[in-house]
Amino acid sequence: MSSYIIAGKADDPSFARAEYAAKQVLALYPNIFMRFEMKHPDEWRDFINSICRKYDFAHYPADFSGPLVWTLEGSLIGGSADFVQAVCLEKFGIKDLPSVSDPSFKHMAADNLKQVKLDHHR
């Protein structure tokens, strides 16, 4: 079973696109595992630095804006575009995904940020 972790800032349309693409994969392949690590923008830098140290993704700079995708086993996939290309398109055949500039991803990112803020206050 393939397992992926997709991490990103809640307000990032690129993360929203990766999340959307992953859900398209899950709709066709329910045995795939996808975990979403949606972080408040203020938490992102500390989070991504700890992930890069933990998995030895040393070539990512401290100010990497994300998103970042890796396997549960710790193999780096890359950023959102790498995930869409290598996993969604090439491995699972998901085609016709909207580009990151599609307005729906800005709306998803705004909704994600609202959710993270709500979760933060609980």
Give the positions of each predicted feature.
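Local sequence-structure signature of Cys/Sec-based thiol-disulfide redox active-site neighborhoods
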Residues: 1-45
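N-terminal leader/targeting and pre-domain segments
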Residues: 1-4, 96-122
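Short amphipathic alpha-helical molecular recognition features
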Residues: 10-13, 61, 75
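Short, aromatic/basic amphipathic alpha-helical patches
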Residues: 17-28, 48-58, 86-90
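Glycine-rich loops and low-complexity Gly/Arg-rich segments
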Residues: 29-33, 58-66, 94-96, 102-104
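Exposed alpha-helical structural elements
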Residues: 46-47, 82
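Structural micro-motif
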Residues: 52-70, 78-82
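Non-catalytic, surface beta->alpha helical segment in thiol-disulfide oxidoreductase systems
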Residues: 70-104
